[in-house]
């Protein structure tokens, strides 16, 4: 169970007879899912959103499947209490390790980022590189999704354990980050890839660094763009698209609200008001302690 400093129940004020006005839930381990939120603002400007960052337990990319399932169920239980109409797993690790299991356990649609990203990649190239967290790379989720679409495509995957901590520490411009990125990209460049997939929603935040290191002909796929396109289609199919003006986005985290707010302003263009949700018994990660 959880407790929240102020987010409880249906604070959006919609009725059960107005499911279209219910919010979309978006979650990630940290700020990476803000790349998906930005796409929702662009593609679905009428939708209200609740964003959750599980910052007390990041990074997800080094966790086991059992841990990820526990975390995801905690978040989805909380989202259910917020009366969301849909949830977007704005986290590739969760999409790889938990999506197929938990989507059978809840009565609202849950979308992941991997399949939309894989479909977009196959449309662009035949020699595809995927950079992701170690857990996503180990799962082979992108390779499997791509090969289900086109088994003739070649796929190379690289796990990038240092990227999420560097991004969460706002070290995008640090020369060390460039050197780390160079080391991760080098084996893919040697394979002469024609397409690179951001296999973690944090990675678009590194776009200037990654683009500067890649050959100019390499196309970049940001699954955040394509999962929101899938959201649009799903909402239309279910008759859940909102035609009313949206309510302000609500932000909540399991870790330090102030730290998330400070990080989020750079990517959102405004300072988000962030509230704390305490999942009982959650140990704060060492990274979150370092950031505090």
Curated annotation (Swiss-Prot):
SUPFAM superfamilies with a match to the protein in the record: Aspartate/glutamate racemase
One BP term from GO: peptidoglycan biosynthetic process
Record Pfam families: Asp_Glu_race (PF01177)
This enzyme's EC code(s): 5.1.1.3
Superkingdom to which the source organism belongs: Bacteria
Catalytic activity field: L-glutamate = D-glutamate
UniProt-annotated catalytic positions: 91, 200
Keywords: Cell shape, Cell wall biogenesis/degradation, Isomerase, Peptidoglycan synthesis
Annotated metabolic or biological route of this protein: Cell wall biogenesis; peptidoglycan biosynthesis
GO molecular function: glutamate racemase activity
Enzyme class, spelled out: isomerase
Residue sites binding substrate per the record: 28-29, 60-61, 92-93, 201-202
HAMAP family documented for this protein: Glu_racemase
Family indicated by similarity: Belongs to the aspartate/glutamate racemases family.
Role according to the record: Provides the (R)-glutamate required for cell wall biosynthesis.
Protein name in the entry: Glutamate racemase
Gene: murI
